[in-house]
Amino acid sequence: MEFIVLLTVCALLGLSCGQHGEYCHGWTDSYGIWRPGFQCPERYDPPEATFCCGSCGLKYCCSTVESRLDQGLCPNEEDLRDGVPSIELPPTVPTYFPFLLVGSIFVSFVILGSLVGLCCCKCLKPEDDTQVSGPAPIQSRLLDQDPSTDTSRHSSSSSASMPRPPIGARPQNLCSLGAENINLYMNMPPTFPMMGCPQNAQFMHPGTAGPSFMQPPFINYAVPAEHAIIMAPAPYIDARNCYGQTSNIYCQVPQQNDQTVCSGSPSKC
């Protein structure tokens, strides 16, 4: 009885051993898709397909020993993490990153250029203002000047440029001047008393060309200061007692001639 029970158990164990083959471990196919492992034979395999055959990228069950796959050469499931190979792959770069990098560089260049331009304008603007506003006071002073001040300044400068005799010096003797420097003649009588001058001498007033017409009150301007008192009537000089008759001195001012002639007929006492 016990012998029969042992034979039955052995038969059952043999049937179980013949139905289960090798175990094919999980793998990753050529598309990167993880394939889980399975037990040979599978559902649609024949019962004799107990060997794991194929390659590391594609596994299946077969019944021939020659086609059996050595799974020790393929990566084990321990080398894989959640169906992904443990080998670290380089991270993929997003497509928008190059455009973002180029745009940021362009914006930074624009901002930097604008800042440099503003700094240059601020540095150069004060120099331009000083150069433009420098001559403004001089121009305003030149524009504010009246023509009267200009004429007075011109006349004063011209008068200053003319030579003046020293203070206390006697005026130049008119008799010593030549006839080439005269343009105003005065015919004085031969008996007229004049110090340092011979008789029949002509007296003149040096200067530039005189006017074509001269009024009688300006005749004394041509006579030196020390001789003007002789021609001008004074209260302390009695011409009638000195010369015996009233001196009749007058000036002939012809309009057609530039020369003014003064004549008189005084007589000595």
Swiss-Prot record:
Segments of skewed composition (Low complexity): 146-162
Positions on the Cytoplasmic side per record topology: 120-269
Intrachain disulfide bonds: none
Source domain of life: Eukaryota
Family annotation (InterPro entries): Shisa (IPR026910), Shisa_N (IPR053891)
Pfam assignment, any one: Shisa_N
Membrane topology: Single-pass membrane protein
Cellular component, GO annotation: endoplasmic reticulum; membrane
Signal peptide region: 1-18
Location in the cell: Endoplasmic reticulum; Membrane
Membrane-spanning residues: 99-119
Subunit structure: Interacts with immature forms of fzd8 and fgfr.
Family in the record: Belongs to the shisa family.
Other comments on record: 'Shisa' was named after a sculpture form, common to southern Japan, with a large head similar to the Egyptian sphinx.
Role of this protein: Required for head formation during gastrulation. Functions as an inhibitor for the caudalizing signals wnt and fgf, does not inhibit bmp, activin and nodal signaling in head formation process. Induces retention of fzd8 in the endoplasmic reticulum and inhibits trafficking of fzd8 to the cell surface.
Name of the protein: Protein shisa-1
